[in-house]
Design a protein with these regions (language model features):
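A generic structural signal for short beta-strands and their flanking turns/coil linkers
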Residues: 4, 34-36, 69, 83
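Short, well-ordered beta-strand segments in beta-rich or mixed alpha/beta enzyme
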Residues: 2-9, 39-66, 88
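Residue-level recognition of specific faces of alpha-helices
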Residues: 2, 21, 37-40, 74
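Glycine-rich beta-strand-turn "strand-cap" elements at beta-sheet edges
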Residues: 40-48, 74-93
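Residues at secondary-structure transition points
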Residues: 9, 13-16, 20, 47, ...
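Short amphipathic alpha-helical segments
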Residues: 14-35, 70, 78
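Short, low-complexity, polar/charged sequence segments that are solvent-exposed and flexible
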Residues: 26-27, 57-60, 70-73, 84
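Short N-terminal helix-initiation segments at or just after the protein's N-terminus
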Residues: 1, 30-34, 85-88
Length: 93
């Protein structure tokens, strides 16, 4: 099992657009082979800070997710508004 924790900080003026774009990623990602969990969370004190929790059955499934059209669309729409992106790829002990 492979899990990713992603912290995304967007420009404050892009926060609502980011929330919508992230919501639009959920269903197509959950339909991908190997996806177990895919959830976004929004910080309660900073509405321009988001966290993503991804759980995949393999590294290959996780890596394939990054090449999908819906991820490409997301990055095209939000790329210029992303101020910081932290990605932590983990595996269970």
């Amino acid at each position: 099992m492979h899990t990713a924790f992603i912290r995304v900080k967007v420009a404050p003026e892009a926060a609502e657009r980011a929330a919508t774009a992230m919501q639009n990623l959920v269903d197509p990602t959950l339909a991908e082979p190997g996806c177990i969990t895919y959830e976004f969370y929004r910080d309660l004190e900073d509405p321009s800070l988001f966290l993503c929790f991804e759980h995949w059955d393999s590294r290959e499934s996780m890596d394939a997710h990054g090449t999908t059209p819906h991820v490409a669309t997301f990055l095209t729409e939000l790329g210029p508004s992303i101020e910081k992106w932290e990605y932590n790829h983990t595996a269970a002990l």
